[in-house]
Amino acid sequence: MRYLFAVIANRTGEVLADHDEMAAIDSFNEKIEAAGQRIMAAGIATPDQAVVFDFRGTRDSITHGTVVDSDLFMAGFWIIEAEKDTVAHALAAEASKACNRPIEVRPFLR
């Protein structure tokens, strides 16, 4: 089963990983890559660089900025493969420790 691990950052904190965090993230990535659990991972731009397109029905809207105004935002993600929730949750704990940020876990819909 696939899971999204969203890396949660705070606008008032450091968004980019420091040298030690990057080393820990690289080590975690190597571990899950070797185990065949890493599908992909990436850091993403801050919400001020987001653009929302809404062309549903008769709408014709392009808005700069994110859809949610919050101090918390997704700063990166992993997509991982795990046999069951307990394995994914254990990996999420490791990911959180590696990047020194909270991780929100969501399973993919089947």
Model-derived features: where do they sit?
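Conserved, structured core segments of small domains
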Residues: 1-110
